[in-house]
Design a protein with these regions (language model features):
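N-terminal Sec-pathway targeting helices
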Residues: 2-13
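C-terminal segment of classical bacterial N-terminal signal peptides
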Residues: 18-29
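Active-site mouth of glycoside hydrolases
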Residues: 35-257
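Extracellular glycoside hydrolase catalytic/binding regions
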Residues: 57, 61-62, 173-353, 372-376, ...
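Acidic carboxylate-rich catalytic motifs and surrounding loops in phosphoryl-/glycosyl-chemistry enzymes
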Residues: 357-363
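Catalytic histidine-centered segment of alpha/beta-hydrolase-like enzymes
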Residues: 367-369
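Aromatic- and carboxylate-lined catalytic core of secreted/periplasmic carbohydrate-active enzymes
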Residues: 377, 381-400
Length: 400
C-alpha cells in the first residue's frame, strides 16, 4: 500500500514537472513570436569618430547622449549600433575610451541594447583625407604602395592592393606586428571595458570590408575565424560579421549567397550576419534581389541576419580619377517617404530577423537630407527632423 502511494506521488510529481516545462516552452514560443526584434539607429559620437588626417570643427552638443537616447526611446526604439573607428582611438585613446564608457552607462540608464561597430569608410583617412575614416595611419605610412590621398574606395588601386594584402595577413606596423593581431588587441581592450554593461549586446569587429577577387572569400573566413577566436577569450556576447563591398551582383567576384556564407566561421555560436540596404526592395527590383541573397546567406550559414544599415538613396554615375565609372549618392534626388519607410519595414517583417538599425543619427549635418534624423538649433539643442517622425510613426504602425 505504501509503495503504491509512493508510486502515485512520483507520477503526480513527474506530471507536474512535465506540465510546467510544456507551459514554459509555450510561453517562450509565444514570446519569441510576439516580441519585436532589435529596432534602432546607427549613432555617431565625437572622439570615437574623429579621423587622424583632418580636423573636425564641430563641437559635441551638451547632453548629446542623454537627449539622443531619450528621443530614440520615445520613438519606440530599443537599439543602437554605435559606430566607432580604430584610427579615432589612436588619435586620442583617453577621450575615445571615456566617451565609449559614457555611452555604455547612458544606454544602461535608458535600457537600450548596443552593438559596437568597428567601422571603416573608404578604408582610412590616410587614403581618403577628405571623407575616409577607419584604419589607423601607421598601417599605411611606411609603405610607398599606399600614398597619402591615393584613394580608399573599392575602385582605387591603392585600396585594392591594401585590402588584398590585409586578407593575406601581410599588413604590418613598423615593428613587424601584423594587422590582424594589432586589431584583435585593440578590440579586446574595447570588449573588456564594455562587456559587463547590461546594455552591451555584442560587437561588429569590421564593418563592410572590401573584397577584390573571388579567392578572397575563404581568406576572409580565416580572418573572421581568427577574430572570433580572439574575442571569444574575453566575451560570450554576440559577434557580428559584416557583408563585404562592393555588392555588384554582376562582378567576377561572385557576390552570391554561397560565397557570402563562406565567410562565416565554423563555430557559429553567437554569430550574426549583418548587411546593408540602401534602396526600396520592391517586387522584382534589384534591391529585392540583393536582399534575398543576404537572407539566403543566413539560411545557408545557419546564423541570424541583421540589417545593420538601411535608408533610401538615389545614385548617379560619375567618373573617378582612374577613369572608371562609379555610382555616387545623389543628395538632391535621395529621399525617403512615409510610404517608403513602411514598405521597407513590411518587407523586413517577412523574414525572421535579428534586428535593424536605420542610417543614421548624428549631430553633424549631412548633405543627404534623409540621413539627418536630428539637427541642431542655434543654441545647440537637438531638434528632430521630419525623418525622425517618419521613422517613429512607421515603427508604431509596424510593431503594434
Amino acid at each position: 500500500m505504501l509503495m503504491n502511494v509512493r508510486l502515485c506521488g512520483c507520477f503526480i510529481l513527474l506530471l507536474l514537472i512535465s506540465t510546467f516545462i510544456s507551459i514554459s516552452l509555450l510561453n517562450s514560443q509565444i514570446f519569441a513570436s510576439t516580441t519585436k526584434p532589435l529596432v534602432g539607429v546607427n549613432l555617431l559620437g565625437y572622439y570615437t569618430a574623429t579621423p587622424q588626417s583632418r580636423e573636425i570643427k564641430s563641437i559635441l552638443p551638451e547632453n548629446y547622449y542623454d537627449e539622443s537616447f531619450r528621443l530614440i526611446s520615445q520613438a519606440g526604439m530599443n537599439h543602437i549600433r554605435y559606430v566607432f573607428y580604430w584610427e579615432s582611438y589612436v588619435k586620442d585613446p583617453i577621450a575615445f575610451m571615456n566617451e565609449l564608457l559614457f555611452v555604455a552607462n547612458s544606454a544602461d540608464k535608458y535600457g537600450l541594447k548596443v552593438i559596437y561597430d568597428n567601422h571603416q569608410f573608404h578604408t582610412s583617412s590616410w587614403l581618403n583625407p577628405q571623407r575616409g575614416t577607419g584604419f589607423p595611419n601607421f598601417l599605411f605610412q611606411n609603405d610607398t604602395h599606399y600614398q597619402y590621398g591615393s584613394g580608399g574606395g573599392p575602385k582605387y588601386p591603392a585600396a585594392a592592393a591594401w585590402w588584398q594584402k590585409w586578407w593575406n595577413r601581410g599588413i604590418r606596423d613598423s615593428n613587424g606586428t601584423d594587422g590582424w593581431t594589432l586589431q584583435a588587441q585593440f578590440l579586446k581592450n574595447i570588449v573588456k571595458s564594455l562587456d559587463s554593461h547590461p546594455s552591451t549586446l555584442g560587437y561588429e569587429f569590421l564593418s563592410e570590408p572590401q573584397i577584390h577577387s573571388v579567392d578572397e572569400w575563404t581568406k576572409i573566413n580565416k580572418y573572421n575565424t581568427f577574430m572570433v577566436d580572439a574575442l571569444r577569450t574575453v566575451t560570450k556576447k554576440d559577434l557580428i560579421i559584416s557583408m563585404t563591398i562592393p555588392v555588384d551582383l554582376k562582378s567576377p567576384i561572385g557576390v552570391t549567397s554561397e560565397n557570402l556564407a563562406k565567410m562565416i566561421p565554423s563555430n557559429q555560436t553567437g554569430i550574426v550576419f549583418k548587411f546593408s540596404l540602401y534602396g526600396l526592395p520592391s517586387a522584382n527590383s534589384y534591391q529585392e534581389q540583393r536582399l534575398n541573397i543576404f537572407v539566403n546567406t543566413g539560411k545557408i550559414a545557419h546564423v541570424p541576419i541583421y540589417i545593420g544599415e538601411w535608408n533610401n538613396v538615389a545614385r548617379e554615375p560619375s567618373v573617378n580619377e582612374e577613369g572608371d565609372t562609379v555610382y555616387e549618392i545623389d543628395p538632391k534626388a535621395s529621399d525617403i517617404t512615409p510610404e517608403d519607410t513602411s514598405l521597407i519595414l513590411k518587407k523586413f517583417s517577412e523574414f525572421d530577423i535579428y534586428g535593424w538599425a536605420f542610417w543614421y543619427w548624428n549631430f553633424r549635418p549631412h548633405k543627404v537630407d534623409n540621413f539627418n534624423l536630428v539637427t541642431l538649433d542655434e543654441n545647440g539643442n537637438l531638434i528632430p527632423t521630419k525623418y525622425y517622425n517618419i521613422l517613429k510613426n512607421a515603427i508604431v504602425s509596424a510593431y503594434k
